[in-house]
Amino acid sequence: MRQTIYLTVNLMQNWVERWILDWANILTWKTLCHQTKIGLPNGAQAFVSAQTSTIPKTAFTAHDFVDYTLPQEQKGKEQKEQQWMKNSQTKDTDVHPYADFAVLEILLFPDSSTDRKIFNHFIQPAIRAYKQLGDSLNIFANQTLDQPKHNRYYLLGYPFLRNKAASLFLNQTEQRKEHMDKTTQILHEKPFVVLTDPAKPTLIRNKGANFTGNTWTSNYDLSKKSGLYHKFLGKKYQIYGKSIVISDLNLSSGSSGSLLLNDRKQIVGIYFGVDGPKDELGFSQLLRWQAKNNDEEKDSVAYDLIFGNKNTTKYYAQFAKEHKTHLYEQIDRSNDQQFTFVKNQKC
């Protein structure tokens, strides 16, 4: 019986069509093959990437998730002067909102040895970690903008290895064009490729001394201050919403799309970028937030990309309801209004 898995990523990677999912974990080689066959010492550890037997597909993308656009005449202004407008009649020249959040759907098949390894060594540990965090809807933080400064933060992503380790690419395929309109996926002659590039195992290693328990630095309104523009399905998009800035989170390439967790064991947002003279500040887009007063919503309204609210036109719980996922089973059992908005909505 196949397994259907949903994984969060940052939307920018999704848009540039990085459809082949790499998974990463620290594995002891004896679980895969004899170390001598791949030139590694007995008991050595490595950073492993494997390709799923089927190409992942997009389950959810956070675009057009609020009923606002940035008209062309507003787009031409200085960013601090730009004002998003309530959407009435959208023009082709208008800029639409997006958030740096997407979900991939991955099918794993038990008759595939690689899929089994992915499930056993990556998916199952992730499920166990989720259950240890509470297996609850409360795992998603829903704070007002004055609350994040009281927490410390942890990034959930690739493992941190202090020592040099090999990189193993397991069962990778290549594309070969046979005809003008046909491309086939074929296995490489070797079932694995070993590299000793030390940069791969340290994808999210901090450049500073601090690695976990980082502190809040400030709130950041992406709708007013960010110049992140993209084109998607013939439309222009600019990032929209609230972000928090975390100190000493200057992580290297590959860490974008990781979950940011606070010290209350709650998911706060998606890590997506850096800033500062030495890239010492890390940015994470909030998935949910509450406004305490109208002034906090003057640049971007309080949205909820997970459970939805009156301001959010597109959110993940709509997909969860349609496909009857584990998340929606929890929503359906809940009587807490902050989680149940989707129950009375048509999907």
Curated annotation (Swiss-Prot):
InterPro entries documented for this protein: Mycoplasma_peptidase_DUF31, Peptidase_S1_PA, Peptidase_S1_PA_chymotrypsin
Protein origin, superkingdom: Bacteria
SUPFAM superfamilies: Trypsin-like serine proteases
Pfam families: Mycop_pep_DUF31
Family: Belongs to the MG067/MG068/MG395 family.
Record protein name field: Uncharacterized protein MPN_586
Native organism taxonomy: Bacteria, Bacillati, Mycoplasmatota, Mycoplasmoidales, Mycoplasmoidaceae
